[in-house]
Design a protein with these regions (language model features):
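Short, well-ordered beta-strand elements
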Residues: 159-161, 167-176
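Residue-level recognition of short loop/turn positions
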Residues: 46, 165-166
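Extracellular/periplasmic catalytic domains that process cell-envelope and extracellular macromolecules
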Residues: 124-125, 162-164
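Short, structured beta-strand/loop micro-motifs enriched in basic residues and often containing a Trp
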Residues: 151
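Generic C-terminus detector
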Residues: 173-197
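Short, well-ordered beta-strand micro-motif
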Residues: 133-134, 161-163
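Short, small/polar residue-rich loop motifs at catalytic or cofactor-binding pockets
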Residues: 154-156
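Short, surface-exposed loop or secondary-structure junction motifs
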Residues: 2-144
Length: 197
């Protein structure tokens, strides 16, 4: 198991993090950088419930490309710049442009996202690509954004969006209990409200 964990970490470092100069992204934080970790609340301030999150200061036991990475705002911004560049950042081509287009295209179509009466993970007017919620049309939703924009969130309230039509992205790095949907929506509204062009 440790061999698989190491290979996953090494693969991501070699193929993604190092080429994009994301040198502060990993599955755990080295001891000399523990003082830089933004610790989430120990208790949910809304209900007082004890919160349990991943201990990023200990060695990772699972290398999941879909969850568990630790990063900085500047490293995450480099990844989002690469996505906005359709797979290229500076002189580094990480993905082909058509691959990024395919990843950020709705693949659900009319497939129901959630059973009737249950909480839907996607807002109205959105579908899902390969790892991203994708906006199908403008309107149909209170969230601002262009058709073709895509987003997702991480543990403890982190969130990002990429809006290719407006040539921009946003990244919200917070550490709080639960998903903090209100703050994610507020962040996006404030970013779009600040646009002057």
């Amino acid at each position: 198991f440790r061999r698989v964990l190491f290979r996953s970490q090494a693969f991501l470092a070699e193929k993604i993090f190092e080429p994009l100069n994301m040198l502060e992204t990993s599955f755990s934080v080295e001891p000399e950088f523990h003082d830089r970790v933004a610790e989430p609340f120990a208790r949910d301030p809304d209900g007082g419930m004890q919160m349990k999150v991943i201990d990023v200061c200990s060695a990772a036991t699972l290398a999941s490309g879909g969850g568990g990475l630790v990063s900085t705002a500047s490293d995450y911004a480099r990844f989002l710049q690469c996505m906005l560049g359709r797979g290229q950042l500076d002189d580094v081509r990480l993905l082909g442009p058509r691959t990024v287009d395919f990843m950020t295209t709705d693949h659900l179509g009319e497939i129901p996202i959630a059973p009737t009466g249950s909480r839907n993970m996607l807002p109205p007017g959105h579908g899902f690509g390969l790892g991203f919620a994708v906006r199908r049309t403008a309107g149909a939703n209170a969230e601002p954004g262009s058709a073709g924009s895509y987003f997702w969130g991480g543990l403890a309230g982190t969130a990002f969006f990429v809006d290719p039509a407006l040539d921009m992205f946003g990244c919200l790095m917070i550490q709080a209990p639960n998903q903090r949907d209100y703050y994610r929506a507020l962040f996006r509204h404030l970013v779009y409200a600040a646009l002057t062009d």
